[in-house]
Amino acid sequence: MRKITTSAYMPTEIEVKSVSENVANITAYPFEAGYAVTLAHPLRRLLYTSTVGFAPIGVKIKGVSHEFDSMRGMLEDVAFFIINLKKIRFKLKSGSEREVIEYSFKGPKEITGADLNNDLVEIVNPDAYLATINEDAELNFSVIIQKGIGYVPSEEIREEIEDEYIALDAFFTPVKKAVYEIQNVLVEDDPDYEKIVFTITTDGQVGPVEAFKNCLEAMYQQMSVFKGILDIDVSAPVASSSASGEFSKLLSSVEDLNLSARSFNCLDKAEIRFIGELALMDENELKELKNLGKKSLEEIKAVMEEIGYPVGVDVLKDSKEQLRKKITELKSQMSAKE
């Protein structure tokens, strides 16, 4: 049953799973009902619009005057050459924001992204097809590679490059796909809390986790404008006054520790139900538990250290009384149901 509170539940868990080099799942929970989508939707939009990438913004081809021209000895006309060029994903090695890269090829040759790698740029999709030229043809062209965010149409790029270059629509974002799913998650017998599961796919210019970090940074920077009227730091998480939010892991059942049957049965007989109860005990208190042997003691100590609450170390400090009170409340509720 949902209780009356004075602040929203503070999410405490974040999980990052690498599916492949360019795909990752990022999960955060638990959120109050409605909060998950409120956060997930703008983050998804920012992933597309704020992630920095590289794109060709202009091309100059020897013997070609405009994008609807054709070139003798090349299978594709210039329009299709440009379409293929925009599909190739460049990454500048120098750290600069703009470079002009020159290329020269003699036929017969099928040109792919791998042929465009050099000391200035890395092609992250080397198998991408560009053009085919016959044995009598020679293809000489230069490309302007620019660093940027989002999408910029060729009409606006026209003003930033020299007249002899054909302006290109620039798709800077390295994020190919960003989707999220809102799932329900159980918190203290309440199934109405929520979990955000992001699936992020990039083209290889940046990794999906790096793209997500950049997205969060962009959101914090945009929110910083409110510092002028609010006496809070919006660039950092605001601490929750909710004990359940702070002690999410500690209020989980000792069953979640996956202890051996001997160790679990000993805790069960001692009516130790929550991980937080172990976190509040020192080694001597554990030794006093009936039938708790040396092996079980060492197992519990190892597991508690693994989850960040080593036995005998005062990690909780000023939060101990608050945790004791919460555990007492939960145990009372459990007894009332029995």
UniProtKB/Swiss-Prot annotation:
Catalytic activity: RNA(n) + a ribonucleoside 5'-triphosphate = RNA(n+1) + diphosphate
CDD domains attached to this UniProt entry: RNAP_alpha_NTD
Region (Alpha N-terminal domain (alpha-NTD)): 1-230
Keyword annotations: DNA-directed RNA polymerase, Nucleotidyltransferase, Transcription, Transferase
GO molecular function: DNA binding; DNA-directed RNA polymerase activity; protein dimerization activity
Region described as Alpha C-terminal domain (alpha-CTD): spans on this chain: 247-338
SUPFAM superfamilies given in the database record: C-terminal domain of RNA polymerase alpha subunit, Insert subdomain of RNA polymerase alpha subunit, RBP11-like subunits of RNA polymerase
A matching Pfam family: RNA_pol_A_bac
Entry keyword annotation includes Transferase: yes
Any one cellular-component term (Gene Ontology): DNA-directed RNA polymerase complex
Swiss-Prot/TrEMBL GO biological process terms: DNA-templated transcription
EC number annotated for this UniProt entry: 2.7.7.6
Oligomeric and partner information: Homodimer. The RNAP catalytic core consists of 2 alpha, 1 beta, 1 beta' and 1 omega subunit. When a sigma factor is associated with the core the holoenzyme is formed, which can initiate transcription.
Alphabetized HAMAP family for the sequence: RNApol_bact_RpoA
Family: Belongs to the RNA polymerase alpha chain family.
Free-text comment on this protein's domains from its UniProt entry: The N-terminal domain is essential for RNAP assembly and basal transcription, whereas the C-terminal domain is involved in interaction with transcriptional regulators and with upstream promoter elements.
Function noted in UniProt: DNA-dependent RNA polymerase catalyzes the transcription of DNA into RNA using the four ribonucleoside triphosphates as substrates.
Record protein name field: DNA-directed RNA polymerase subunit alpha
Gene (UniProt): rpoA
